[in-house]
Amino acid sequence: MKKISRRNFLLASGVVTVGAALAACGGGSSSSTAASSAPASSAAASAPAAAEGKVLNIWCWNDEFQSRFNDYYPEVKEIAADKSTTTLKDGTTVKWTINANENNNYQNKLDEALLNQDSAADDDKIDIFLIEADYALKYVDSDYVLDVKKDIGLTDSDLAGQYQYTKDIVSVDGSQRGTTWQATPGLFAYRRSIAKDVLGTDDPVEVQTYLSDWDKFNDVAAKAAAKGYKMLSGFDDAYRTFSNNVSAPWVTGTTVTVDENLMKWVDQTKEYTDKGYNNKSSLWDSQWASDQGPTGKVFGFFYSTWGINFTLLGNSLATPTAEGGKEEVGNGIYGDYAVCEGPQPYYWGGTWICGAAGSDNLETIKDVMLKLTCDEAIMKQITMDTQDYTNNEKAMEEIAKSDYKSDFLGGQNHIALFAEAATKIDMSNAGPYDQGLNESFQNAFKDYFTGNVEEDAAKANFETAIKEKYPELTDVVWPA
């Protein structure tokens, strides 16, 4: 597979500055073209060994990996009060650059920095950056990322315990260019008290029998509405479950193909909105968060692994931990959630660690990857402490078969369900345009759901949006 060109790397992020566009077309100086000659990863592999740098620059979009690093990387010595830096035992200073994900902000700033990587001072070069599943291929299929085996030095044996899909999604032509501490299968998290009221049971096995396909799921939505509840919070909640079960990638060549399964999401969401089965919220807005808390009347939420411990738990509390609240039964609806498989297997998100071409900290990067993504004991401890689902099959199977219980989930061992779901994840239809096209598709149809435009107008708005964002994509094909 031919790697993404410098110009298409920029186009895939949806933004091309005038200067960058000129450089991409050959109008820039040689110092500004990070990938103008041989692939950076190849250069890194053939370069003589150099002394390790004393500054490790890590770029990410929130503090999740920062927390994992500071709490579980054995070489951490001290953490600055403002958490802007972490000092390692060998004296290396880890500098954290955190740019929020909203409106492509993280990718835009990361892209600019990577394009200037060659000309940056050694202590300013990016060493590690984090990527998500939705846009992983944009980066790993470029010359800005190091091969974790050939360039960084991990071995097949080091990586053997990880879920295969977590390696496949960051691999191009056999070259693995990232690694992760987490696997992210999805489940359906529901309110126990609401399930009891609507279905007469809160038992996960029994609840699953009512939600095992979309027809049954829709039947429960009607029953929930009759009891005064919403089945889902908003427009976006079920989207991943549909988009992860498409029959082909979004883009082939320069043609965008809208999968039939996405139109099933449109039909269901329109029906739920018209019938009052949702609260018309959008993912991450205040209504959506509130619906997960003590005053919420929503039956459930589609969440993957990180969502349980990183988002849902926090939203369930009446008194946030930042205000002195404790993660315990009695604080809000802590303990009132449970999880089941839901109507279809899916995944949501996941964060991969990438080594940046041009880094002078390859040994440190290797050690970070080894300890935080390959060490079975550390992976198991992260799960035991945080309820996150980590990327080690043996460790997760041990917990799944143990007497482990989540107090937040009313004593349920949710790791057992995640372990079963993780083996069903299929990343074969992932592509570099996924994030932008998924967001544009969801945004275009919100006006249709609320009755502001007809369906044909929503389709036209989607086509306009993606042609503005990705001018190299020339055609859009809709299901017959």
Regions found by a protein language model. Name each.
Residues 151-158, 168-238, 250-283, 357-363, ...:
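Helix-loop-helix "hinge/cap" segment bordering the ligand-binding cleft or interdomain interface
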Residues 83-102, 121, 202-207, 270-284, ...:
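A local structural motif
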Residues 70, 74-75, 264-367:
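Extracytoplasmic/periplasmic substrate-binding proteins
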Residues 68, 192, 370-398:
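Periplasmic-binding protein-like
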Residues 3-5, 10-137, 156, 380, ...:
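Conserved N-terminal structural module of periplasmic/extracytoplasmic solute-binding proteins
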Residues 99-112, 212-216, 280-292:
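Short helix-initiation/N-cap motifs at beta->coil->alpha
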Residues 40-47, 118, 131-187, 324-339:
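Hinge/lid segment of periplasmic solute-binding proteins
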Residues 331-335, 383-443, 447, 475-480:
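Long, aromatic- and glycine/proline-rich binding clefts that accommodate carbohydrate-like moieties
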